[in-house]
Swiss-Prot record:
Transmembrane segments: none annotated. This is Glutaredoxin domain-containing cysteine-rich protein CG31559. SUPFAM superfamilies: Thioredoxin-like. Residues 33-45, 70-84 have a biased composition (Polar residues). InterPro entries: Glutaredoxin (IPR002109), GRXCR1 (IPR042797), Thioredoxin-like_sf (IPR036249). Residues 217-227 have a biased composition (Basic and acidic residues). Belongs to the GRXCR1 family. Residues 58-69 have a biased composition (Low complexity). Residues 30-88, 217-239 are annotated as: Disordered. It comes from Drosophila melanogaster (Fruit fly). GO terms for biological process: sensory perception of sound. Pfam families: Glutaredoxin, GRXCR1-2_C. Residues 295-400 form the Glutaredoxin domain.
């Protein structure tokens, strides 16, 4: 809207001229402040420079005061104060901010739309905007905080790079320290290579002997399989089992639980040892052994590390003889090295069976492991079918059980070398009758002794 400048009359009084100019300027100010100029600016059409500015000097020639005020009003109407401040701030930021950040700011400015409240409702219905505002896309919304995201990403990348660098330096220092330390500092020779779930677990050393015994047991079983043909290796394996049991448990171990069950530990979520399995069962076995007769402990120490089978070689009762043969065949099939004690050939074994069974009758066969009673022929056959007997006798497996003694032929008994089985005393002669009742004291009642190789 262009306001024409009224011509200034040369004639007339000065008061009328002043009033005419005042009314024109007042109308012009009301038009500028009414909001119509903002409505014109809201349209997408480019604004042209106002022609009233060119005619300004002609109308301002009469009064300099009114001319300066009119020029200020026209400039304020053509260019809002907020836009001037924004342009000034952009010029200042343009000298400080990078080009990429300025480009993001311009993109955000393109999505801003000024809502016009002074436009009438009828004009809003008729007027169609040249450019329909689009909904801001998620990419546009994400770009509003692009500068902050870039700063955070750069900072995180720097932190990760520093962490990786320091971690590599720490690992290099740890490797150098571990190589400089002697090998004896690592417990069991493999503790330095353990990857702990928690850093504090490296300072815990609970039940270290159990892991060492487990490795020693596997190594000992391999050595026993290779070098158990001689008597020296047998004594070494027996002493190894004895030492292992003393380290694991102070009392008597229940052999029915198996040898591997004594080494299984109860661990928490952090990996710390909270207990050992079957300790209560072993304690009960110890209590029951102590409650038996006083000579029971002697049998326990006598049969420590051995598998003892009481049998008979008398074939009059075929059922008993067959049961004894079946049990011996099962033990040989499992490659178990056992000691056979024939109650028919030795009265001493008969008395020993009566003491162990706490009965006047002797029933064979009977199997004992580590001095603990396992059962008769039916129990052994049932355990063999279920596979429990194999696990029970696994520590006593030996290749020496397949070989037959060349001295006694597998009977474990030999004639007495002193009396040659006659039971005659060496002090007896054929010329006097005083020493007829003398008998050999080096052998049993039938003139037999135990095989020195078996």
């Amino acid at each position: 809207m262009v306001l024409a400048t009224p011509p200034v009359s040369k004639g007339g009084n000065a008061g009328g001229l002043f009033m005419d100019q005042y009314q024109q300027y007042a109308a012009h100010c009301e038009t500028a402040d009414s909001g119509n100029g903002s409505d014109l600016e809201s349209t997408g059409l480019p604004t042209k420079p106002d022609d009233s500015e060119e005619s300004g000097p002609s109308s301002l020639g009469s009064d300099s005061m009114h001319g300066s005020s009119t020029e200020y009003v026209r400039q304020s109407a053509s260019q809002p104060s907020g836009q001037r401040q924004r342009q000034k701030s952009l010029r200042v930021l343009g000298a400080l901010l990078p080009d990429s950040l300025l480009r993001d700011i311009r993109d955000r400015r393109s999505t801003e739309y000024v809502v016009q409240f002074s436009q009438p409702e009828d004009e809003e219905k008729i007027q169609v905007p040249d450019k329909i505002p689009e909904k801001p896309s998620p990419f546009r919304l994400a770009r509003e905080s692009l500068s902050e995201d870039k700063i955070e990403e750069l900072r995180a990348a720097v932190e990760r790079a520093n962490f990786v660098q320091t971690g590599e330096e720490t690992l290099d220092s740890i490797d150098a320290t571990s190589q400089s330390l002697p090998a004896s500092s690592n417990i069991g020779g493999h503790r330095g290579n353990i990857n702990y779930k928690y850093a504090d677990d490296q300072y815990y050393s609970f039940h270290i002997n159990e892991h060492e015994n487990f490795g020693a047991r596997s190594a000992r079983s391999g050595d026993e399989a290779d070098h158990s043909t001689g008597a020296g290796s047998e004594a070494g394996s027996d002493s190894g089992i004895l030492t292992e049991q003393q380290d694991l448990f102070a009392g008597y171990r229940d052999v029915r639980c198996g040898a591997s069950s004594t080494q299984s530990t109860i661990r928490s979520a952090k990996g710390t040892v909270r207990g050992v399995k079957n300790r209560v069962r072993n304690g009960i076995a110890t209590f029951l052994q102590l409650q038996q007769q006083p000579n029971a402990k002697n049998f326990k120490e006598k049969d420590l590390g051995k598998v003892v089978l009481y049998t008979t070689s008398m074939g009059i009762i075929r059922e008993t003889y067959t049961k004894c043969a079946n049990v011996k065949q099962i033990l040989r099939t499992l490659l178990v090295k056992f000691e056979e004690r024939d109650v028919f050939m030795s009265v001493e074994y008969q008395a020993e069976m009566r003491q162990r069974m706490q009965s006047g009758q002797v029933r064979v066969p009977q199997l004992y492991v580590e001095g603990q009673h396992i059962g008769d022929a039916e129990t052994v056959e049932r355990m063999n079918e279920s596979g429990e007997l194999r696990q029970l006798l696994k520590p006593y497996k030996s290749m020496a059980s397949t070989y037959t003694c060349q001295t006694c032929g597998g009977y474990r008994l030999l004639p007495c070398p002193s009396c040659n089985g006659s039971k005659k005393s060496v002090h007896r002669n054929h010329f006097t009758a005083e020493f007829v009742a003398l008998k050999c004291m080096n052998c049993d009642e039938v003139g037999l002794v135990k095989c020195h190789n078996c």
